[in-house]
Amino acid sequence: MSGRTVSVREGRRLARTIAIGPHGMTADEPEPISADTGPTPGELLLAALGSCTSMAVRAFADRHGWQLHHVDVDVHFEPQGQIVKNIRLVGDLEPAQVERLLTVAGRCPVHRLLTGDVSVTTVPTVVAAARR
């Protein structure tokens, strides 16, 4: 995974400006909670999982010279807190190749992060507001 720091800055209402190296985007919540100027944080998490899965499958198939013409991944949350990945593989693939690609799909770094034993450390920095 990337060693870049992801910086998030407060915007208008609940909107947040995200900077990742030279890339930028906005996260927000839908109306009426906020202005719906970008995907929600949960949707960004699903996007990370889907794109990581697709990249891992593509890289593996290409490395082995397999005839994978296209890979699409749709990811959604289930009400019970489960994440479901639907993977569409288009190509001239043997059943054993499909099985191997599905195994690879479950081993992408984001998938492993979400299903592993993860700890998050919060390091506070408190800056007092200037008094007027």
Predicted segment positions?
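Extended beta-strand/beta-hairpin segments
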Residues: 1-47, 55-132
